[in-house]
């Protein structure tokens, strides 16, 4: 195992084309940080990947018969779940209803103050996504280009605001490890050497997605969703207001053994296996003694490519049961998260509560939500402080160390029991 001694940071800036570049101007533009313990809570898994990575990309660990031919075998390059670019709208009708997706004869409300915190949220659009001709035409046209509208979830931009942030646009074929600023210069060795030829960098995908959001086709199509009839995309300086970053859903996964990396290893080469989520309450009990918390979310696999939205020729949502028809997706059941999921066998002093955590790809479809990442983050923060205070590397924790960390978490209000 290797040992991280320092990380080097540099400012970034977005250029006029929308591409994020290194910003080396000024005496304070670069910073070197030394430390005893390092934590990678990133989406890209950059520190994990650059230090000493023994894991896999995307869904590489799936059964080979659930992968495309170019994802299989030792030279296979696996796909990553679709990304999204959030955008802002105004003109939402919060009284909108829609046919219930489980029974079209019934109606359901789309918007409400669901947390009673003064901020409204909304989710819906499955019926329109499946049946509305304008939405279908948009997806048929833009899907092959790597973009598609999906049923939405959205939130008001603060109490009483007329503006909303919307998660509705899928962006396919994005390599969450790949950034334009690593194409040249001092960091060119950091660009992934195994990027798929049909994939885009995060930066190029962000720029293209913003262009799609700025199109009249997009504006007309979103108005077909319930509550969106009079909605318009909010603009600033002539361009749509969008998220500063792409919402990535998957990048890399830390494995237990680098030599065992292969297709069909989702139940053997990860601290948290697929079955720990598929059969929670049984197989995950082996992790009870070293648990750091609970993962509580359903297995929510988004599309890996546009074709996943139309498994049998018609648009479907959600797509989990189609892309993984070989397994039975359970109802929500909490899963014990072991300490080994955030430690890595390849670096003595690195903790990974971010996307690169030691979870098989199918399990990551449940672990990828922010509340579950907060559970990992709480554990990593406590473990890092404990390691520094006790002068021990996180990878070398014994059972007494694990128990001590569990007690700190419990005393802080963390849930460690089902």
Feature annotation, model-predicted:
Residues 1:
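N-terminal cofactor/phosphate-binding cores enriched in small/glycine residues
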Residues 6, 13-37, 41-378, 383-416:
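Flavin (FAD/FMN)-binding glycine-rich loop and adjacent Rossmann-like elements that form
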């Amino acid at each position: 195992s290797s040992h991280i001694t320092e990380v080097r940071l540099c400012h970034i800036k977005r250029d006029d084309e929308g591409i994020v570049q290194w910003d080396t101007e000024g005496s304070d533009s670069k910073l070197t940080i030394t430390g005893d313990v390092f934590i990678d809570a990133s989406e890209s898994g950059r520190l994990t990947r650059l230090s000493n990575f023994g894991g896999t990309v995307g869904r590489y660990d799936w059964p080979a018969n659930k992968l495309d031919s170019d994802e299989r075998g030792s030279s296979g390059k696996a796909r990553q779940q679709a990304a999204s670019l959030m955008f802002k709208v105004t003109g939402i009708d919060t009284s909108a209803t829609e046919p219930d997706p489980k029974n079209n004869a019934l109606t359901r409300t789309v918007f409400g103050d669901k947390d009673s915190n003064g901020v409204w949220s909304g989710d819906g659009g499955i019926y329109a996504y499946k049946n509305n001709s304008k939405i279908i035409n948009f997806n048929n046209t833009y899907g092959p280009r790597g973009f598609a509208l999906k049923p939405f979830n959205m939130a008001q931009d603060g109490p009483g605001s007329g503006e909303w942030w919307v998660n509705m646009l899928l962006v396919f074929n994005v390599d969450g490890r790949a950034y334009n600023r690593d194409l040249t210069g001092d960091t060119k060795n950091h660009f992934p050497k195994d990027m798929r030829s049909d994939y885009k960098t995060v930066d190029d995908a962000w720029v293209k997605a913003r262009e799609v959001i700025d199109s009249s086709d997009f504006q007309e199509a979103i108005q077909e969703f319930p509550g969106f009839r009079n909605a318009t995309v909010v603009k600033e300086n002539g361009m749509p207001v969008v998220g500063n970053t792409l919402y990535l859903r998957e990048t890399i996964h830390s494995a237990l053994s680098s030599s065992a990396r292969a297709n069909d290893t989702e139940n053997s080469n990860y601290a948290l296996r697929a079955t720990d989520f598929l059969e929670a309450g049984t197989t995950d009990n082996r992790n009870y003694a070293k648990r750091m918390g609970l993962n509580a979310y359903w297995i929510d696999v988004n599309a890996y490519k546009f074709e996943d939205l139309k498994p049998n020729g018609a648009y479907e949502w959600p797509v989990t049961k189609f892309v993984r028809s070989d397994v039975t997706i359970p109802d929500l059941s909490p899963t014990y998260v072991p300490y080994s999921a955030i430690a890595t066998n390849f670096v003595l002093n690195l903790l990974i509560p971010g996307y690169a955590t030691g979870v098989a790809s199918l399990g990551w479809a449940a672990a990828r939500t922010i509340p579950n990442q907060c559970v990992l983050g709480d554990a990593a923060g406590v473990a890092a402080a404990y390691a520094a205070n006790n002068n021990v590397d996180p990878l070398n924790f014994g059972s007494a160390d694990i128990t001590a960390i569990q007690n700190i978490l419990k005393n802080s209000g963390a849930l460690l029991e089902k």
